[in-house]
Swiss-Prot record:
Organism this protein belongs to: Yarrowia lipolytica (strain CLIB 122 / E 150)
Domain description: The DHHC domain is required for palmitoyltransferase activity.
Residues spanning the membrane: 21-41, 57-77, 172-192, 221-241
GO biological process: protein targeting to membrane
Residue numbers on the Cytoplasmic membrane side: 1-20, 78-171, 242-401
Name the UniProt record assigns to this protein: Palmitoyltransferase PFA3
Length: 401
């Protein structure tokens, strides 16, 4: 037991350390890369015999891209992903939640924005977070690292020490692409220096093969060239994947997991088919690649490259999203089919029960059969004779002829 507590404590402190250390590493690498790219390479006149103006402009462009990377990084961390608990009526008071849990037949009233929700939890009901004690709108999930529910949750990024969600998704995608561009800028400048250095070694090699008099290349330049190549491949791949998700209007969670949609018959009731999901009927939030891109990056082309968010009127507040009408129609058809199957099966079960009751009544063994019914009739002759006998004689109809 003590060992488990130590493991949890160690994990907690490692997470806190990484949360504080990794953002420093990211910003340091960006600043260091700009310094090496601009000052040690592009602004070094000895490295280039001609086109010094081009390389100086090239260096300034790389620094501008690096500054944009830092601005986007700060935007991702400062703006945050957004949480449903920050929106009115989505948080439930603790006393009201406790009363609803303790009293039978008492239910919590969801906000009006939840009336049009298309996503459902496993039991078919509206999605509710018992950790945050609040309602979860479509595409929202609870992040254990962020310790809150996140609007349009994508993933938790330790390099930013925050979650990526509805409000900072655009900044995150732009950051990936600007870092990729910066890597290619640095790779171009350092690669050109390295290439010239190789040519210089070949041209100045003496008859004895001695190259001691050839100028040495900077260690910073070599390290930057290697890191730029590695990060260009890694971050570039992730940036391409993120842009693919933007065009499909999907988050990383929705790409990896199936989203269950609401049905007319919740799973908690007596169901006969599986509820419709994103894998069976399609992505209901996919409204076309162009509109999907505009919802995240903005309506105007100049907004696509700048850290400027579209207006809330254009993209909403993260609780409701435009829906694909064709997929929505499939969800409704699946719900109607489920209701039809349920009604047919319930009618069949009712009919079978009635037939079973009749069969049980007529198929009893002989010794369990009820005795013949006895009927009582008036004996008119005995009544007329005046004899002292009962006025009613018991006559068994089965024995009468």
């Amino acid at each position: 037991m003590q060992c488990r507590k130590c493991c949890f404590a160690c994990e907690k402190w490692c997470f806190i350390g990484a949360k504080a250390f990794l953002p420093l590493v990211v910003n340091f690498l960006i600043i260091w890369a700009c310094w090496v790219h601009a000052w040690l390479v592009c602004w070094e006149p000895q490295l280039f015999e001609s086109d010094t103006t081009f390389w100086r402009v090239y260096g300034v462009a790389g620094v501008a891209i690096g500054i944009m990377c830092n601005v986007l990084y700060l935007k991702v961390c400062k703006v945050g992903p957004g949480s449903p608990t920050d929106i009115d009526n989505f948080s439930v008071p603790l006393v009201e939640y406790q009363n609803a849990c303790s009293a039978e037949g008492q239910h919590l009233t969801p906000p009006r924005e939840m009336a049009n929700s298309v996503c459902a939890k496993e039991n078919g009901g509206l999605r509710f977070c018992t950790k945050c004690i609040g309602w979860k709108p479509d595409r929202s999930h609870h992040c254990s690292n962020y310790k809150r529910c996140v609007l349009k949750f994508d993933h938790y990024c330790p390099w930013f020490a925050t979650a990526i969600g509805f409000h900072n998704h655009k900044y995150f995608v732009l950051f990936l692409w600007y870092v990729t561009i910066l890597c290619f800028f640095c790779l171009g400048s350092t690669g050109f220096v390295f290439y010239n250095h190789i040519l210089e070694i070949g041209a100045m090699r003496g008859p004895d093969g001695n190259t001691d008099y050839v100028g040495a290349i900077s260690v910073n330049v070599m390290i930057l060239m290697v890191l730029a190549l590695v990060f260009a491949i890694a971050v570039g791949t992730f940036a391409t994947f993120s842009l693919y998700l933007v065009f499909n209007n999907q988050s990383t969670v929705e790409f990896l997991e199936s989203t269950q949609y609401r049905s007319a018959v919740p799973t908690a009731a007596y169901r006969y088919t599986f509820a419709p999901t994103s894998k069976t009927v399609g992505n209901v939030f996919d409204v076309g690649w162009k509109r999907n891109f505009q919802l995240v990056m903005g309506d105007k082309w100049w907004m696509w490259l700048l850290p400027i968010q579209p207006s809330e009127a254009a993209r909403g507040n993260g609780t409701q999203f435009p829906l694909n009408k064709q997929v929505l129609q499939k969800i409704r058809e699946a719900a109607a089919k489920e209701v039809q199957i349920r009604d047919q099966n319930q009618a069949y079960i009712k009919q079978q029960r009635q037939q079973q009751q009749k069969r049980t009544q007529y198929d009893l063994p002989q010794h369990l059969q009820p005795p013949p019914q006895e009927h009582y009739e008036y004996d008119d002759e005995a009544q007329d004779s005046g004899d002292d006998i009962p006025l009613i004689n018991m006559v068994n109809k089965n024995n009468t002829k």
